[in-house]
Design a protein with these regions (language model features):
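Secretory targeting and sorting signals
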Residues: 1-44
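Gly/Ala-rich beta-loop-alpha elbow adjacent to hydrolase catalytic centers
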Residues: 128-134, 138
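Active-site catalytic pocket residues across diverse enzymes, especially alpha/beta-hydrolases
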Residues: 81, 145-149
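A conserved short beta-strand
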Residues: 151-170
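Surface-exposed loop and adjacent secondary-structure segments within mature catalytic domains
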Residues: 181-200
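Active-site catalytic motif of lipid deacylating hydrolases and related acyltransferases
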Residues: 47-125, 197-246
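Extracytoplasmic/secreted cell-surface and envelope-processing proteins
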Residues: 63-66, 98-99, 137-139, 149-150, ...
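Active-site nucleophile loop of the alpha/beta-hydrolase fold
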Residues: 167-174, 196-198
Length: 248
């Protein structure tokens, strides 16, 4: 079940120690199915698919939903997309301080949802995002398996064609020199991985306040511009993902 799933029409744009310690800081194939359900139902499904689907994982201890950073990023992105419809899925997970239990739960939920959207809405551009622990959730489903700290359900490679961009903020893996843009062979080139100044969660700095200032420093808007450009440059359609291969 989703924590939050909404679709909105965006307005026109008005202006252009140890890894454990570190982390604690922070079945029918799609084509065959379409043939069975018939063109009328398939068309109805296509009409219900948003142009863009944002899948966002909130930070530790934030209330259910995309979180403060996630909501700001989504709003900035809607303003950048010139009228394209935007669906929002808030990753359903505890976001608790028990990181090694919480983050893998989020990764499993996010992976299942992304695969479902890729199979049922192949023309939808998927955007992955996360803040703080939520950024680590995104790391788990997109990174090289060797970097996933025991999580064993990375998304199938074919799903990458459906993901237009990835935006993460305050990512704990940055602190150990492994930003998502560097550790993900399939998603690295389409990723913006932002650390706010001396944020100690993602850098060797000690400015704790910086971890709470991603909206105020304009980094959500910067990420939205990057993602909007990636969506504009994406091909019109991606290969069909076989629904029998999805998780969920």
């Amino acid at each position: 079940m989703s924590e939050r799933r909404t679709t909105a029409q965006s307005p026109d744009r008005s202006s252009a120690g140890s890894v454990r310690r570190l982390l604690a800081m922070a079945g029918i194939g799609g084509a065959f199915a379409a043939a069975l359900i018939g063109p009328g139902t398939a068309a109805a499904q296509a009409e219900s698919c948003p142009d863009v689907e944002v899948v966002f994982a909130r930070g530790t201890a934030e209330p259910a939903g995309p979180g403060r950073v996630g909501q700001a990023f989504i709003s900035d992105l809607q303003n950048s997309l010139n009228g394209q419809s935007v669906g929002v899925y808030a990753v359903n997970y505890p976001a608790s301080y028990d990181f090694l239990q919480s983050a893998p739960q989020g990764a499993g939920d996010a992976s299942a949802h992304v695969q479902s959207v890729a199979a049922s809405c192949p023309d939808t551009s998927i955007v992955l995002g996360g803040y703080s622990q939520g950024a680590a959730v995104v790391d788990l489903i997109t990174a090289d398996p060797a970097a996933t700290f025991g999580f064993g359900q990375p998304m199938p490679p074919a799903v990458a064609d459906h993901v237009a961009a990835v935006a993460v903020f305050g990512n704990p893996s940055d602190k150990i020199g492994r930003p998502l843009s560097a550790i993900s062979p399939l998603y690295g080139a389409k990723t913006v991985d932002l650390c706010n100044g001396a944020d100690p969660v993602c850098s060797n700095g000690d400015d704790r306040a910086a971890h709470s200032l991603y909206v105020q420093t304009g980094l959500t808007d910067q990420a939205a511009d990057f993602v909007a450009a990636r969506i504009s440059a994406a091909p019109e359609s991606a290969p069909m993902v076989d629904a029998s291969d999805t998780v969920g």
